[in-house]
Amino acid sequence: MLVFIGLGNPGPRYVLTRHNVGFLFVDELLKKFQIGSSYRAETYEAFKLKSQSPAIAVKPLTYMNNSGIAVRDLIRDFGLSQNDRLIVIYDDVWIPLGRLRIRERGSDGGHNGVKSIISSLGTQEFSRIRIGIGPKPDDIDMVSYVLGEFTDSELKVLWKVLDLAISAAQEMFAADFKKVMSRYNSIGVE
């Protein structure tokens, strides 16, 4: 089963903030697939996708820094195993806006949501789609930057890169993960 976990913060205050690109990814993914059923737990909401292979899309409801609690609960509730591919989608300040990076595993890269998942699971062995939000300006602290909203011009680029990420996700159903990774890691939008 493919398990797309979009990281973000719940609530209307965070909808279009940089830290919510994972939630925005899930919203866009749900527009491409019909929802077979949905499930809301205390720590997450999950949507079974009507697709060629079993898949779910998930939004943790624990706030970013506690995402690992939601992922741990999800794995328990759905009986997920090592045969299932967890794909965590999140913002990355080290990647320029308009680019994404797909990886099979890796460190937290300083991202607190990913750090929480690694801590809860005890492993870095899960896939990622890192969506670039660009570096923070010198005159603002990191928390203010990632919790700040995208500008109108940034949103235009973001919607394009989210389309790219959705295309990559759709190809993951049929293509080898390494091929998808190789193809999409070299593409950018403006």
Swiss-Prot record:
The record marks D91 as: Stabilizes the basic form of H active site to accept a proton. GO terms for molecular function: peptidyl-tRNA hydrolase activity; tRNA binding. SUPFAM superfamilies: Peptidyl-tRNA hydrolase-like. The active site is at H19. Keywords: Cytoplasm, Hydrolase, RNA-binding, tRNA-binding. Its main location: cytoplasm. InterPro entries: Pept_tRNA_hydro (IPR001328), Pept_tRNA_hydro_CS (IPR018171), Pept_tRNA_hydro_sf (IPR036416). It is found in: Cytoplasm. It is an enzyme of class 3 (hydrolase). Signal peptide: none annotated. It catalyses: an N-acyl-L-alpha-aminoacyl-tRNA + H2O = an N-acyl-L-amino acid + a tRNA + H(+). Gene3D superfamilies: Peptidyl-tRNA hydrolase (3.40.50.1470). Its EC number is 3.1.1.29. GO terms for cellular component: cytoplasm. TRNA binds at Y14, Y63, N65, N112. The keyword Acetylation does not apply. The record marks N9 as: Discriminates between blocked and unblocked aminoacyl-tRNA. One of its GO terms (biological process) is rescue of stalled ribosome. Pfam families: Pept_tRNA_hydro. Belongs to the PTH family. Hydrolyzes ribosome-free peptidyl-tRNAs (with 1 or more amino acids incorporated), which drop off the ribosome during protein synthesis, or as a result of ribosome stalling. Catalyzes the release of premature peptidyl moieties from peptidyl-tRNA molecules trapped in stalled 50S ribosomal subunits, and thus maintains levels of free tRNAs and 50S ribosomes. Monomer. This is Peptidyl-tRNA hydrolase. It comes from Kosmotoga olearia (strain ATCC BAA-1733 / DSM 21960 / TBF 19.5.1). The gene is pth.
